[in-house]
């Protein structure tokens, strides 16, 4: 399954917030997001994201790409995974046919097409790092 197909599958958000902020919110979310993406908060956020991915790496084979899937690094070492998180990251779990995307300009990561077991594991890993996993309306 390629990236385009996976991006069309059901997805969940791995986030600092437990659910989607209402659209009618008066802009506080964007002010909070801007603060979280600034130094020094962005380093703490990056560490949480990396922790989830490194722990997931202990359980699953991973492939990573920072060029929208043009090239893949199979079984990256932890340092490569850490460095890749500083770019637009595509993390493929080939044994699950699942994909995680992460962008340094976002406070969340997105998990596409997880099996029930993978979703349960990611929930546990994220919770341990103070993150939430929730599913937005699909469509």
What does each of the following model-derived ranges do?
Residues 1-109, 113-139:
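Structured alpha/beta or helical-core interaction and ligand-binding surfaces enriched in interleaved
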